[in-house]
């Protein structure tokens, strides 16, 4: 009888273990992150909460740079916001797009040097933007990056999403949040 109960218990554990879902909606608590920089505000959909990496720092031109990021094994969200400073105006949208691409390519090293960016004009809540994509391969996997670049109320925004092609949850998350960016239209 004792063996029967153990076998039944083991069978139930195996059966119930197979009933679990590996869908991202069951694993992540999707939400929105509101980010304010200067007079500009964006709302970014994300699978998790993420925060500001540092207090406002400066880029190589002395312009204030605010960075927010979140990353786990399936997905990454990166937001940078650059403001103009005295003697260092913001780059144009096209220049800002190229700068964001160059920054990521440099971070990726050899894998980034071999990869090619594609880009297309898009609208983010009526604001002219550029959507850039890059697939960078390394160690038998491909990391997919999508970056949205736009300028709003004196702030150059670069919002980047990333996931591995070997992560089904990463792909599912990407379908839920990629490009879901609101540019608020508050007065003042």
Language-model features: where?
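N-terminal targeting sequences that direct proteins away from the cytosol to non-cytosolic compartments
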Residues: 3-66, 141, 161-188
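Signature of long, low-cysteine stretches enriched in small and polar/charged residues
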Residues: 55, 103-149
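Short, surface-exposed beta-strand/loop micro-motifs that present aromatic residues
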Residues: 64-71, 144-152
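Short, solvent-exposed coil/turn segments at beta-strand boundaries
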Residues: 71-76, 127, 150-156
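A short acidic-to-branched-hydrophobic micro-motif
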Residues: 67-98
């Amino acid at each position: 009888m004792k063996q029967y109960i153990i076998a039944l218990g083991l069978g139930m554990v195996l059966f119930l273990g197979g009933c679990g879902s590996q869908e991202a909606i069951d694993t992540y608590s999707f939400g929105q992150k509101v980010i304010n920089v200067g007079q500009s505000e964006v709302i970014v959909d994300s699978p998790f909460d993420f925060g500001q990496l540092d207090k406002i720092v400066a880029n190589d031109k002395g312009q204030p740079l605010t960075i927010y990021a979140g990353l786990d094994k399936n997905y990454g969200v990166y937001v940078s916001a650059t403001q103009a400073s005295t003697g260092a105006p913001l780059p144009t949208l096209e220049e800002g797009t190229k700068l964001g691409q160059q920054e990521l390519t440099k971070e990726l090293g050899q894998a980034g040097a071999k990869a090619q960016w594609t880009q297309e004009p898009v609208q983010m809540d009526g604001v002219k933007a550029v959507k850039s994509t890059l697939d960078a391969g390394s160690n038998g996997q491909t990391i997919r990056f999508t970056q949205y670049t736009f300028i709003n109320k004196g702030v150059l925004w670069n919002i980047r999403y990333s996931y591995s092609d070997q992560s089904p949850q990463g792909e599912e998350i990407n379908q839920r949040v990629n490009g879901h960016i609101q540019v608020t239209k508050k007065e003042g």
